[in-house]
Amino acid sequence: MLGKFIVFEGGEGAGKTTQLNLVFEWLTGSGWTNRIKGYIQGDYPSVLTTREPGGTALGKSIRKLLLDVTATGNESIDERAELLLFAADRAQHVSSCLLPHLQQGALVLCDRYTDSTIAYQGYGRELDLTLIHQLNQIATQGLVSDLTFWLDIDPEFGLARTHDREQDPEIETDRMEANEIAFHQRLRQGFADLARQHPERIFRIEAHQSDDVVAQQIQGILESRLQEWYP
């Protein structure tokens, strides 16, 4: 695997998307994008930004089904069906987007990946973790992030933030945000457990701080990794 895979994780309102975009701007402005370009094979961008769910054409349709409560009418989504839809989105995303870019040397910035499924469906929905790990293994073909930033925030504070932010124009009412507070507390514990289990990969960032402070912390960690990856 020639490229590097960086993931941004966290609960609702943690600021993942904001920080991913700030990292992309920083990479471009600081010259890293041009430096990485020297490692690219073929006609691929040096830095790719993407997300789950919704990083492919198929994924966009799955994303609306998963997140928009109006997409399925009055019919609720079974928890196992939800899990399988996330797995389907990931399988398509890995095979048609992530692997092709990584194999050509790109630096990939992704908004959510496997840790979200463990936290949301495993801890939040309390589904079987062994089953989730098996599905993740199938969907990812073994692809693991090189670096994950977990933006940790108190669920009540994060949910309050979501009411003030610019909403996804494709999602009328977010299904995940609508869950009870206990769900969000459980998934936060899931991320905490993952961070303890994988300290070499997952970095916890206190996300209640200002965007600028959080960005500086993330960029400081990433700068040292980039020096190692692209000497």
From Swiss-Prot:
Entry annotated with the keyword Membrane: no
Binding site for ATP: 10-17
E.C. no: 2.7.4.9
Gene3D superfamilies registered for this protein in UniProt: P-loop containing nucleotide triphosphate hydrolases (3.40.50.300)
The UniProt record lists the keyword Transferase: yes
Gene Ontology molecular function: ATP binding; dTMP kinase activity
GO biological process, one term: dTDP biosynthetic process
Enzyme class, UniProt record, top EC level: transferase
Record SUPFAM superfamilies: P-loop containing nucleoside triphosphate hydrolases (SSF52540)
Catalytically driven reaction(s): dTMP + ATP = dTDP + ADP
Any single Gene Ontology cellular-component annotation: cytosol
Sorted UniProt keywords: ATP-binding, Kinase, Nucleotide biosynthesis, Nucleotide-binding, Transferase
Protein family: Belongs to the thymidylate kinase family.
Function: Phosphorylation of dTMP to form dTDP in both de novo and salvage pathways of dTTP synthesis.
Annotated NCBIfam families: DTMP_kinase
Protein name per UniProt: Thymidylate kinase
Gene encoding the protein: tmk
